[in-house]
């Protein structure tokens, strides 16, 4: 029986590692099939057509056959083409993109479809590609990253509702302060909390997440808030993400901390 073939599938390479002297295992994020592991035979050879194409943060179209008996979740890459559209991000934008890739690797189950999240990721990568070494458009990075973190957590069911206290379901008061903490969800802020947002800010974020075009709406809510929310939101979302990722610390986050970029 012929192996099932998946053709012309939109995809991004999240990570790659050696499989043999000449081949690679690719962890990819595909639009219709989620996170998929592919073996790219001969990809390390200088003459391989795969070699210049299988790069992170680049839109691809891949063709592969499903792994047969004994191959489990690893499938055979048969073709890959650059889908075009933008250049490779650099500098802080590149590190940010690799951070998003690590989140997807740590939090997404293999072959669990997340088409809306794929579209959000593709949009974020396009923004990252516009940030140059001198930091042009760099002010867009924070809202974009925070939006993706929120949407990722929501997509995989790890984000509590942002319109009520998690433990009591009491509605939020617009002027009160609330903190999002890993063990308890959203609760009234304490003096010891490193970061918190007002009830009105959390409600605005929940409203954006409920919009049909949730990525655009969430990005707008963060970027245009009357009081800056990105910094306090970063502290809370990073703690929640690390809690669900478990140990060790995210490698890209540690690298950015070492470079004093976080």
Swiss-Prot record:
Sequence similarity: Belongs to the RecO family.
Extent of the signal sequence: none
Gene Ontology BP term (one): DNA recombination
Entry keywords, A to Z: DNA damage, DNA recombination, DNA repair
Transmembrane segments: none
Pfam families: RecO_C, RecO_N
Protein name: DNA repair protein RecO
One cellular component (GO) term of this entry: bacterial nucleoid
Species, as recorded: Acidovorax ebreus (strain TPSY) (Diaphorobacter sp. (strain TPSY))
Superkingdom in the source lineage: Bacteria
Purpose of the protein: Involved in DNA repair and RecF pathway recombination.
